[in-house]
Amino acid sequence: MTNSVFQGRSFLAEKDFTRAELEYLIGLSAHLKDLKKRNIEHRYLAGKNIALLFEKTSTRTRAAFTTAAIDLGAHPEYLGANDIQLGKKESTEDTAKVLGRMFDGIEFRGFSQRMVEELAEFSGVPVWNGLTDEWHPTQMLADYLTVQENFGRLEGLTLVYCGDGRNNVANSLLVTGAILGVNVHIFSPKELFPEQEIVELAEGFAKESGAHILITEDADEAVKGADVLYTDVWVSMGEEDKFAERVALLKPYQVNMDLVKKADNEDLIFLHCLPAFHDTNTVYGKDVAEKFGVEEMEVTDEVFRSKYARHFDQAENRMHTIKAVMAATLGNLYIPKV
């Protein structure tokens, strides 16, 4: 019999966890953050080996998993797209069975949700989803921890996601918010509304938590009562060929100071999972400006650098929340119930 409700479990999608479990992980994240700030060791994974599989590139996810693993006393091993043969020269099942005999836990960041599920099914060790095309669960813990840090609560708050309403971040914000009792508004063009299956899943959780779900094209309706404005890139990895179409579609959904003022809330915060294209100080930004005449994309530089911005706190919280997930599922902690 295990002493923890989390021990040995994988973290593949938020919908697999109860409200109490997600709240516990957010609370554990805050505790581990405090230990880190006070330089108190918390080596719950001493002697463990962690595989970091990256089919998609990353800055924050890789850095967060690496530093979190080291803080916990584990050894992280990075395996990039050129190091792994998932589904190419070797099946995901076979790869999972090999890695599960060498590593104590596996992180996967890539395209297919089915692939991360197969890793969990066949490896025999906890697997953590660092991002797939469908879900971004580790990001959600960081997002909602950041919201809780700013407001002291989650239930009853209103978060508005602006932009591509059918990407992984929008899916995860919608479902996780519904589980946690957060009102989630998706402000998006109809062409990019979330899939009906995702909306119905969120609505089911919202009935239990009392959260309100809204999907709309109307800016005034979307930001009414907003506590949090959130956006993400207009073009997700693997969709670069749709750039012109997305820029044209999503210009009206940019987070700018006019939208902030519509919310009429001095306590409002702005979140972004990063990277953000808010100026032309990158090769990418310059290229977009030259091709499409847009110098600021999903968020203006004014909002990005404003008093409302909390995205760098949010980015730091990736490390603390990922650490909590790894410790809870692999660290033999005493968590008999939540």
Swiss-Prot record:
It is an enzyme of class 2 (transferase). The keyword Cytoplasm applies. L-ornithine binds at residues 168, 232, 236-237. This is Ornithine carbamoyltransferase, catabolic. Its main location: cytoplasm. NCBIfam families: orni_carb_tr, PRK00779.1. GO terms for cellular component: cytoplasm. It catalyses: carbamoyl phosphate + L-ornithine = L-citrulline + phosphate + H(+). One of its GO terms (biological process) is arginine catabolic process to ornithine. Reversibly catalyzes the transfer of the carbamoyl group from carbamoyl phosphate (CP) to the N(epsilon) atom of ornithine (ORN) to produce L-citrulline. It is found in: Cytoplasm. Its EC number is 2.1.3.3. Belongs to the aspartate/ornithine carbamoyltransferase superfamily. OTCase family. Keywords: Arginine metabolism, Cytoplasm, Transferase. Carbamoyl phosphate binds at residues 58-61, 85, 109, 136-139, 273-274, 318. GO terms for molecular function: amino acid binding; ornithine carbamoyltransferase activity. Pathway: Amino-acid degradation; L-arginine degradation via ADI pathway; carbamoyl phosphate from L-arginine: step 2/2.
